[in-house]
From Swiss-Prot:
This is Gastrin-releasing peptide. Keywords: Amidation, Cell projection, Cleavage on pair of basic residues, Cytoplasmic vesicle, Mast cell degranulation, Secreted, Signal. Residues 54-148 form a propeptide. The gene is GRP. One of its GO terms (cellular component) is secretory granule lumen. It is found in: Secreted; Cytoplasmic vesicle, Secretory vesicle lumen; Cell projection, Neuron projection. Belongs to the bombesin/neuromedin-B/ranatensin family.
């Protein structure tokens, strides 16, 4: 055996020879079935009290401070809710106002009927009923349409 393996063998030997017993000793009276099942107490209560830590200061002092803080936060939220409600009501009142009447006699059409020089008569070129791609009427692309 080498020098490094000797401590491991001794540790294994000690662990094998150690007496095996209960993890938690039971009271001498034997106790009830529940104490045998849950020797460390009721798990429901343990789970609910796990985060609770005791502090040196009185709880009434901290409760008064937290109550004041809660009241301040409540008042702030109440004011914010009032402001939001006022904004919503103002927006609804603005939307429900009737539109202002406009003068109907002075309206100008959105297009000028006299300026029709920008419109081209595309149907007179080429054969009727024949469709072509946009821009295909340029010279060089479709020679039969360019002849007239």
């Amino acid at each position: 055996m080498r020098g490094r393996e000797l401590p491991l063998v001794l540790l294994a030997l000690v662990l094998c020879l150690a007496p095996r017993g209960r993890a938690v000793p039971l009271p001498a009276g034997g106790g009830t079935v529940l104490t045998k099942m849950y020797p460390r107490g009721n798990h429901w209560a343990v789970g609910h009290l796990m985060g609770k830590k005791s502090t040196g200061e009185s709880s009434s002092v901290s409760e008064r401070g937290s109550l004041k803080q809660q009241l301040r936060e409540y008042i702030r939220w109440e004011e914010a809710a009032r402001n939001l409600l006022g904004l919503i009501e103002a927006k609804e009142n603005r939307n429900h106002q009737p539109p202002q009447p406009k003068a109907l006699g002075n309206q100008q059409p959105s297009w000028d009927s006299e300026d029709s020089s920008n419109f081209k008569d595309v149907g007179s070129k080429g054969k009727v009923g024949r469709l072509s791609a946009p821009g295909s009427q340029r010279e060089g692309r479709n020679p039969q349409l360019n002849q007239q």
